[in-house]
């Protein structure tokens, strides 16, 4: 959405979307000494008496919906708000199967609002707050059997799974100034942030 209101004094830019990130692996690994032909690295040339097999099979999926909106006033003041919700397979079998993380930012183009000295071509101040979340590694919330190469069997896991696991959250904020001087010949970009 890209709309202007009140004789172009108020602007609205908005986006809504969804995504699926789906990653899978289904692999078998075979290692061992070579049988007859030197430097011929092929599974048919591996000595069956020394060979060891390992299998890996996993499937991760994150389903997401997201939205962002920017409200502008008189080409001077801008408010930006975003939000995203993820459903991650790594958090299956937990009470916290999905997680939401928002952000909000405010910027002011001072050079469009106030008469500044000629030496200052452009001046903008900005501030924002954001929260970011990420899911844990796979198999921490459900039982995983491990493959034993010596016995060629799957074994009961030594560690227990955690159904109370939650996503990792990071909150941060930042303040900044962008300035240009002497007809845009000198640029200054300063940011102070904390995470």
What are these language model-derived features?
Residues 1-195:
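Extracellular/periplasmic, surface-exposed regions of secreted and cell-surface proteins
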